[in-house]
């Protein structure tokens, strides 16, 4: 089990980014959350098996159609045992 905190910069709000990340996380069995931030970024936490989390990080680098991702920051964190995925 691993945990990653991801901050996505670019035109990523108002394009369904959070919803597409949530669907992708649920289909991969990854727990965590995704949220729009006041500065225009999207922040997410992913917890799960390494391959599934890495797949979500890759997905975040592209996002849904309509999103323009300029930069993605990824920080390793200690897992907290999250059990579900939510949109904040």
Predicted regions and their residues:
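Intrinsically disordered, low-complexity, mixed-charge
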Residues: 1-88
């Amino acid at each position: 089990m691993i945990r990653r905190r991801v901050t996505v910069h670019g035109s990523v709000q108002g394009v369904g980014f959070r919803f597409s990340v949530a669907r992708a996380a649920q289909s991969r069995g990854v727990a965590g959350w995704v949220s729009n931030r006041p500065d225009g970024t999207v922040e997410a936490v992913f917890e799960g098996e390494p391959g599934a989390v890495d797949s979500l990080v890759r997905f975040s680098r592209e996002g849904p159609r309509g999103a323009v991702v300029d930069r993605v920051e990824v920080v390793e964190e200690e897992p907290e045992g999250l059990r579900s995925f939510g949109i904040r």
